[in-house]
């Protein structure tokens, strides 16, 4: 028996938070900054046909602070490419499993403790300079990853 395929007609993202915030140590190290220095923090809820499928937490290097004056519900990589020509590449990444906290469950419209696929990815530019550190919490039963 196979799972029923769902065709998504409307994919969008909703901005939850965008700010300059002090970076935790792990993130600052990847972005080649001192812990506590400012980074561009962006939190998004990703939706498919108005159903939450993922939460995206991303820390951009401070050189991308101009993002805070852009429409963050559009494609951020496209904004960066058009603005300064930066091309992005995956430096490292991995998949893991975690359980939804109460806050995550509320945003994703799942039960607290539901298993979530966690995708962590570090992105660099063509010169190897760090662009962003990302963590996405994915509702596996509502999402398909393509490789």
Spans of model-derived segments:
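Short linear motifs at protein or domain termini
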Residues: 1-8
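C-terminal all-alpha effector/ligand-binding and dimerization domain
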Residues: 9-147
């Amino acid at each position: 028996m196979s799972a029923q395929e769902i065709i998504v007609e409307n994919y969008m993202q909703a901005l939850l938070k965008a700010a300059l915030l002090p970076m935790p140590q792990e993130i600052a190290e990847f972005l080649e900054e001192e812990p506590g220095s400012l980074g561009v923090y962006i939190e998004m809820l990703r939706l498919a046909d108005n159903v939450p499928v993922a939460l995206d937490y991303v820390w951009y290097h401070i050189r991308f602070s101009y993002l805070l004056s852009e429409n963050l519900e559009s494609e951020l990589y496209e904004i960066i490419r058009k603005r300064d020509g930066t091309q992005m590449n995956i430096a490292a990444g991995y998949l893991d499993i975690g359980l939804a906290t109460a806050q995550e469950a509320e945003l994703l419209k799942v039960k607290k403790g539901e298993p979530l696929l966690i995708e962590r990815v570090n992105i660099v530019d063509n010169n190897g300079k760090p662009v962003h550190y990302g963590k996405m919490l994915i509702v596996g039963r509502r999402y398909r990853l393509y490789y």
